[in-house]
């Protein structure tokens, strides 16, 4: 599962974006959400999705807006699922919390985490698929390249 936690940047000095952000995400991703997008901690929104394509699209949308620090947590969630995202828990939610905290210190305001963290020893053979660190690096490159585009480039 993929948990996206987005924390509004400079929320004390900006308009409240969490309510409209939640509503916009809910409308845009209707039918692709495991649970409804929820507002958490006042200035945060959180979403739970089951597929990587939706998670990536949501990360790209939120970071493009420029108003959010975005954490992507990947892992399992505790079942049975509650009715509200803010009531759900599990390793993916813990990872998303760690990721959004790291995102606040990132130039792209994005970070990815898994729980438990996965690491490869130097002597391990490379896996067939990229690990979390490689995926985060690729997304960071994508975000940096995208941020250099002019409005006319869109």
Predicted regions, residues:
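Regulatory and interdomain segments flanking nucleotide-handling catalytic cores
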Residues: 1-154
């Amino acid at each position: 599962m993929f948990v996206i936690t987005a924390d509004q940047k400079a929320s004390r000095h900006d308009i409240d974006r969490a309510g409209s952000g939640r509503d916009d995400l809910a409308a845009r991703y209707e039918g692709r959400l495991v649970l409804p997008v929820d507002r958490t901690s006042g200035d945060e929104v959180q979403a739970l999705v089951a597929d990587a394509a939706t998670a990536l699209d949501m990360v790209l949308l939120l970071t493009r807006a420029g108003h959010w620090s975005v954490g992507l947590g990947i892992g399992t969630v505790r079942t049975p699922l509650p009715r509200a995202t803010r009531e759900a828990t599990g390793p993916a939610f813990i990872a998303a919390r760690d990721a959004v905290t790291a995102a606040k210190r990132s130039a792209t305001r994005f970070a990815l985490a898994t729980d438990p963290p996965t690491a490869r020893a130097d002597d391990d053979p490379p896996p067939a698929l990229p690990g979390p660190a490689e995926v985060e690096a690729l997304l960071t490159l994508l975000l940096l390249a995208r941020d250099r585009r002019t409005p006319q480039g869109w």
